[in-house]
Amino acid sequence: MSVVTRFAPSPTGMLHIGGARTALFNYLFARRNGGRFLLRIEDTDRERSTQEATDAILDAMEWLGLTPDEPPVMQSAQVDRHAAVAHDMVARGTAFRCYVTPEELQARRDLGEEKRQAAKQEGISDAEKEALLAEASQLLAPFRSPYRDGASPPSPDAPFTVRLRAPESGPRTVEDGVQGTVTIDASEIDDLVMLRADGTPTYMLAVVVDDHDMGITHVIRGDDHLRNTFRQVPIYEAMGWSVPNFSHVPMIHGNDGAKLSKRHGALSTTAYRDMGYLPEAMKAYLLRLGWSHGDQEIFTDEEAVQVFDVSGINKAPARLDLDKLATVNAHFMRLAADERLFDLICPVLSKNCSLSDAEVARIRAALPHMKDRGSTLIELANAFAFLYAKRPLELNKNAVKALSDEGKLRLKGLYDDLQRMSQWSGASISETIKSYCAATGLSMGQIGPPLRAALTGGLPAPDLAPVMDWLGREETLARIDDQLAG
C-alpha cells in the first residue's frame, strides 16, 4: 500500500502553529514512507471562508517548504460528488431522509435542559428527580431520528435533510496511532446530517468522500477530531470503502499548561516569519513539540524524514516555549549560508534606514563573524547598527563617561599611531594597539572603553580590531576624530 497523507485546513483564518505542526507531521510521514503528501482546502463554510485566508495558508506552507505533491484540492469544487454519495447511501438504505426541522431539534434540546434544571430544584422527591434526569438524558442524548425507521413525511413537499443511519448498538473501536485503542458505545453516535435541507453537504460527509477520492491512507490530525472519527467511520463502512489509519495528535498548550491563546504567542505561522525566525528552525521546533526520538533535540529536514514516525508522538499536550524556539533559531542561523542570511536581514535593515554601498560592504564583511549576535533575524540585523550609525555618533551614558578628558587624551595618542599605519587589516590594527599600550604603559582596560565609545557610541559590538577593519580606515579615523574634536 502506497502511503498518502493530507493536510486539510479551513480558510477561515491564518495558519496557526498547531496547524503548521499537523502539516509537518503529515509531510514527514509521507516522505519517510515514500508516499505522497496532499493539500485540501476545506472551504465549504461559505460565510467564514475567504480567499485571503486561503492565500495566507498557501504562503505559510510555501515558506515552511511543505510542498504538496499535487495541486491543492478545493473542497467546494466537489459538492456535487458529496451530494451524489449521500443520495447513493439513501438508495443503499444506509442513510435516510429526515423531516425534523431545526426548530424542532432546538425545542427538544431546550426541553431537555429545562428538565435537567428542574431536577436541581429543592422540594422534589428522589423519584421525581430521577424521572426528570432520565427524561433530560433522553432528550439531550445523541439524536436518533424518528424517520430512520421509515416514518412517513409530514407532507409530500416537506423539506428534508439526509442523515446517516448510525450503528444501532454495541462497542465501536478505533485503533489510533497516537491514542491507542479507543472504544465508545454506538449509542454515543448520532444520526448525523450529511446533506442540509438546501442540498449542500456537511463537513462530516465531505471529509470522508474527499479522503476516499484522494486515496488517503493515513489521517494525522488534532485530537479535537477524535470523536468525529466515530461519526465518520460508519460512512466509510456504508459505502464499502477502506477506512484509513487514524492518528490524533494532542493540542499545543501555553507554557503554563493552559489552552493556547494569543497571550502565549499563538500567532499565525507567517507572523513568526515576520518576527525573524527561519523556516528550518520553525520546522525543527514544531517537530519536537510533542514528538521525540531518543535524546536528540534538533533535527535537520533530512534527519527528520529519516526518523519520523507517529509512534514517537506523545499523548499529552505539548507546551509552547518561545525561549526554546529562539534557541533553535539561533542554532540554524549559525548554520545558514552567509549570502542567504544577508538576503534575509536586508528587508529588516532597509526598514531602519537607507544603506550606502560602503555600509552594505561593512555588514557583508562582518556577517560571518556575527551570526551568534542574535536569536532572530531582527536581533541580528539590529546587532549591525554600529556599522551604519551616522556621524557624529550619538553617545549613550557609558560612552560619554568613557570619553572623559583623560579618555580622549589616551585616545589621541592611539589615533596618531593609527593614522601612520600603511596597511589596514584586523591583524595590523591589533598589533598597533598592542604596541601603543606597550609604549605608553596603558592596558586594554584603559584604552578599550574610549576607543569603543568613539567607534560605536556605546552600541554593542565585537572585538575592536575586527570592528575597525569592517569600518575601514577612513570611517574609523573619522569617528575617532569626531570625538576628539568634540
Swiss-Prot record:
Keyword list, A-Z: Aminoacyl-tRNA synthetase, ATP-binding, Cytoplasm, Ligase, Nucleotide-binding, Protein biosynthesis
Motif 'HIGH' region, residue range(s) on this chain: 9-19
Binding site for ATP: K262
Locations listed in the record: Cytoplasm
TM annotation in the entry: none
Motif interval(s): 'KMSKS' region: 259-263
Enzyme category, top tier: ligase
Membership in a protein family: Belongs to the class-I aminoacyl-tRNA synthetase family. Glutamate--tRNA ligase type 1 subfamily.
Description of how the protein assembles with itself and partners: Monomer.
Protein name listed in UniProt: Glutamate--tRNA ligase 1
Source organism of this protein record: Hyphomonas neptunium (strain ATCC 15444)
